[in-house]
C-alpha cells in the first residue's frame, strides 16, 4: 500500500528499548473502499509495537484522499498489519546497526517474556499468550543462524581480499498480529468483531 512511515525508537546503550514513535501518511485513494472507520485503530495503531516489550509508544495516522485507486483494493492483507510489522522490524534492524548489536540478540532482549502474559501493550492491545523466546531459539537453530553469521563474515573477508563478489545477506523478522476483524472492544464503531481469544489443548481441540 501507499504508506509513508516515519519512526523514532529510543533505547539504552545495552539495547533495551524504552520508547517508540511513529507517524503515518496513508493514501486512501479517491475514496475509502473499506467504509470502515476502525480500520486503522484495529490494525496499525495497536500492533506496531510488535512482539516487543516497549513501555511507551505513540502512533499518529493521517489518511489522505488522492486521485489513485482506493487504498487496500489491489493488495490483500489483514488490517494493515503488514505495514505495522514492516515498520517495527525495520526499526529494530536500524537500532541493531546503530548499537553494533546482533539483530537476533537485540530482538531476544526485547521480546515480551512468557511470564508477562497476558500482556497489554503501550497502545492498549491485549496479548493473551505466547513464548517468543522458545519459538525464536527454535527458528534460529533450525536455520543454523550461528553458521550463517560465520559464513557471512567469511564472505565479507573474502570480498575485501578481492576473492569474491558474492556476499550473504541475512533477513530476520518476528511479528505478532491480529486476525479477522479483531477483538470486539476495538471494533465498537463498526459494530462487529471476532473471537477475542481461544485456547487449544494438547488434543488440538479448540
Residue ranges: model-predicted function:
Residues 152-163, 167-190, 195:
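Flexible, glycine/threonine-enriched loop-and-boundary segments that flank and lead into catalytic domains
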Residues 73-151:
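N-terminal leader/propeptide and maturation segments of large enzyme subunits in energy/redox metabolism
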Residues 7-9, 199-202:
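Extended lipid/amphipathic-ligand handling interfaces
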Residues 2-91, 176-194:
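Glycine-rich loop/linker segments at domain edges
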Residues 205:
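Conserved small/polar residues in nucleotide/adenosyl-binding loops
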Residues 27, 98, 167-169:
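Short glycine/serine/threonine-biased micro-segments
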Residues 44, 63, 145-163:
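Charged, low-complexity, helix-prone segments enriched in Lys/Glu/Asp/Gln
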Residues 1, 18-23, 54, 104-112, ...:
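Beta-strand segments within the central parallel beta-sheet cores of soluble alpha/beta enzyme folds
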Amino acid at each position: 500500500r501507499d504508506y509513508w512511515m516515519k519512526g523514532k525508537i529510543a533505547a539504552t546503550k545495552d539495547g533495551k528499548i524504552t520508547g517508540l514513535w511513529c507517524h503515518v501518511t496513508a493514501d486512501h485513494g479517491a475514496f475509502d473502499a473499506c467504509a470502515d472507520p476502525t480500520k486503522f485503530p484495529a490494525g496499525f495503531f495497536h500492533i506496531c509495537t510488535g512482539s516487543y516489550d516497549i513501555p511507551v509508544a505513540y502512533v499518529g495516522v493521517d489518511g489522505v484522499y488522492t486521485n489513485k485507486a482506493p487504498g487496500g483494493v489491489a493488495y490483500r492483507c489483514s488490517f494493515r498489519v503488514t505495514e505495522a510489522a514492516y515498520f517495527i522490524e525495520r526499526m529494530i534492524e536500524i537500532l541493531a546497526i546503530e548499537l553494533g548489536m546482533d539483530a537476533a540478540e537485540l530482538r531476544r532482549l526485547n521480546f515480551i517474556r512468557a511470564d508477562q502474559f497476558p500482556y497489554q501493550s503501550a497502545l492498549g492491545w491485549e496479548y493473551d499468550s505466547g513464548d517468543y523466546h522458545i519459538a525464536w531459539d527454535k527458528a534460529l537453530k533450525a536455520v543454523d543462524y550461528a553458521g550463517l553469521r560465520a559464513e557471512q563474515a567469511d564472505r565479507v573477508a573474502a570480498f575485501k581480499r578481492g576473492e569474491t563478489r558474492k556476499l550473504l545477506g541475512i533477513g530476520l523478522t518476528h511479528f505478532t498480529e491480529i486476525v479477522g476483524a479483531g477483538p470486539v472492544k476495538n471494533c465498537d464503531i463498526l459494530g462487529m468483531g471476532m473471537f477475542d481469544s481461544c485456547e487449544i489443548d494438547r488434543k488440538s481441540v479448540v
